[in-house]
């Protein structure tokens, strides 16, 4: 699924000459030995909900791994990226009241020439 989203995003940037922002949200257990997969899956569903209610209709999200979601922000100005990530983080922590996980994220940009920044 990730490959399809990335290919779509790459074609989009070439065709429309717009930049995309990639945000990779990662769920991190506070205890390195944490192994409750069912609880982790529930928390990932919570993250999915937080992302869905926080994105615009044109933006895309896809599950990247058992602990990660990739968000593709289409033609989002640099100064608004923190607004979106803050909204997702706030939504997540309002819904998730547990103490086993924290949420982190990394941002990359796909330029019009398809290079990553």
Model-predicted regions and their roles:
Residues 1-10, 14-24, 28-52, 62-65, ...:
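Conserved long alpha-helical elements within nucleotide-processing catalytic cores of c-di-GMP signaling
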Residues 12, 53-58, 90-100:
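Short catalytic/binding micro-motifs of nucleotide second-messenger systems
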Residues 12, 34, 69, 80, ...:
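Sequence-level detector for tyrosine residue identity
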Residues 21, 59-74, 97-117:
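A short glycine-enriched loop-to-beta-strand structural element that forms part of the catalytic core
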Residues 38-39, 85-88, 94-96, 104-106:
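Short, intrinsically disordered/low-complexity patches at protein termini
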